[in-house]
Design a protein with these regions (language model features):
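Short, contiguous pre-domain boundary segments
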Residues: 5-18
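Non-catalytic accessory segments flanking enzyme active sites
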Residues: 17-61, 65
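Rieske [2Fe-2S] iron-sulfur-binding domain
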Residues: 49-118
Length: 118
């Protein structure tokens, strides 16, 4: 597989990218760091979580995310994994939960991400 520099050396301004740009893992790793981890990403619409406890799940570059509506209408986004053992907390695409509960050891997190019970 060609390196990023080899592909870039042949790239002509104003022309579309060669197939290698879309398949090269080195380029994807670079884009993850330079673009995806440093930019705002669309995750959903606020109307998808209208009520306190409503949540949607989302994945960004293999990182599971949960977005949940707080009791006062605020919106929180967290890694959808327990900080204890890394278990996925919300396994459904969407739903409503009064708290975020890890299925592994039942650690309980508030909607704002604070640990309530361990």
């Amino acid at each position: 597989m060609e390196t990023r520099n080899q592909l870039l050396s042949r790239q002509r301004e104003g022309w579309s990218l060669e197939q290698g740009f879309y398949l090269n893992p080195e380029i994807f790793d670079f884009e993850k760091e330079a673009i995806w981890k440093n930019s705002w990403l669309f995750a959903g619409f606020t109307c998808e979580i209208p009520n306190p406890g409503d949540y949607i799940t989302y994945s960004v570059i293999d990182q599971p995310i949960v977005i949940i509506r707080g009791d006062e209408g605020e919106i929180y986004a967290h890694h959808n994994t327990c900080r204890h053992r890394g278990s996925v907390i919300c396994t459904e695409e969407s739903g409503n939960e009064p708290n975020l509960v890890c299925p592994y050891h039942n650690w309980v997190f508030a909607k704002n991400g604070a640990l309530k019970n361990a």
